[in-house]
Amino acid sequence: MGALNQTRVTEFIFLGLTDNWVLEILFFVPFTVTYMLTLLGNFLIVVTIVFTPRLHNPMYFFLSNLSFIDICHSSVTVPKMLEGLLLERKTISFDNCIAQLFFLHLFACSEIFLLTIMAYDRYVAICIPLHYSNVMNMKVCVQLVFALWLGGTIHSLVQTFLTIRLPYCGPNIIDSYFCDVPPVIKLACTDTYLTGILIVSNSGTISLVCFLALVTSYTVILFSLRKQSAEGRRKALSTCSAHFMVVALFFGPCIFLYTRPDSSFSIDKVVSVFYTVVTPLLNPLIYTLRNEEVKTAMKHLRQRRICS
């Protein structure tokens, strides 16, 4: 409580992506277009799955949740980044900074757990197909989604508590375009070595353990595909390769950012742009371009809309 009472900083100032005004204007248009396409693409996937009965199965149930999380995840940081590209003084209040930090880790951690669950779903479907309907029924799927949100919330609460328990009495300049734990705790008026270790341990353990679980699942799947027919192998590889591309695009930046006690914020900003702006857009593109069922369902919905 004493640490909280010492807090005197009321707002933070972002340095942003660059200090070059011309580059900021040039960045604004493509980032705005990317964000709008992210919202549209992921929203279309959710709507398509909800209104297509034959897609009401575990794989697409999880995919719709992934699209929802991507919408939320990008919306936590991108609007503030776009605002900062147009303003000379990029500020955020202390309370809003902590809120942004909380929701950033909530959605990021929930996505990590969801991608791990999706890998397990594919493992059951391909390796033990006769038990799939019993193991992955809708009741279990709903329970898994509840568990991943609970896990994401607990992780985010831990990260947020470790951040706000520190005293902030200046400076208040964040070398980033959004509030995240590493750049924020650097501004604390006390030694943050132990806090940094705890934060890296929390995020790093989750990222690495889930990534190892994913790699293990796909390794077992690849070995089991030798027993499948040519058509079965083709369909399974198409689904799994799309999912693994999403995993690599998301886990790579997360492991890079959150498993190092010391960060280079100039490099971190580039990596952060990739996983907060680019990856949420690539997810719907990867799944729709490589998934005939989703593409066909979207065409049917469009035809129904035209006919009505």
Swiss-Prot record:
Tissue: Expressed in olfactory epithelium, specifically in the olfactory sensory neurons of the septal organ.
Outcome following mutation: H300K: Decreased receptor activity in response to MTMT binding, even in the presence of copper
GO cellular component, one term: membrane
Transmembrane intervals: 25-45, 58-78, 98-118, 144-164, 205-225, 237-257, 269-289
Impact when changing C179S: No receptor activity in response to MTMT binding, even in the presence of copper. Little to no expression detected on plasma membrane
Effect ascribed to mutating C141V: Decreased receptor activity in response to MTMT binding, even in the presence of copper. Complete loss of receptor activity in the absence of copper
Pfam families cross-referenced by the UniProt entry: 7tm_4
InterPro entries attached to this UniProt entry: GPCR_Rhodpsn, GPCR_Rhodpsn_7TM, Olfact_rcpt, Olfactory_Receptors
Family indicated by similarity: Belongs to the G-protein coupled receptor 1 family.
Name listed for the protein in its UniProt record: Olfactory receptor 4E2
Gene: Or4e2
